[in-house]
Amino acid sequence: MVIEIRPRETVMLAADFQALVTWYQDVLGFAVTDLFEDDYHYCCLETPSGIKIGIASAEEMEVEPADRSTNTVVLQIEVDDLAEFFAHLTEAGGTVTFGPSFEKTNEFWFGGFSDPEGNPVWVVDKNCP
């Protein structure tokens, strides 16, 4: 038996729900597609290219956020020009955690950054296989 699964958003639990939602909107260009604030705080966001994330209140989910730089699940995105993206990110107060570095075998640029709460995000350029 094969059970069909479908994509949904990757969810991040935020210590400061509104601040993290605003950062993903202002810095990375995500748009709010759904917002729930009555019984709990949860926001669905999506980029014009179709990347979906969800942000929820960690406190309401009874989760105490730890050192997020050690997360074993990492969001990865692609941009056309990594140097240009990192310049934008730095100007907007983002934190580049590594890179940009060039992968010689497959000839693409890669790096990483963290959002204001320390969630790691990996970035590759359009040449990444």
Set out the residue ranges of the language-model regions.
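Conserved active-site tyrosine of GNAT-family acetyltransferases
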Residues: 20-25, 89, 118
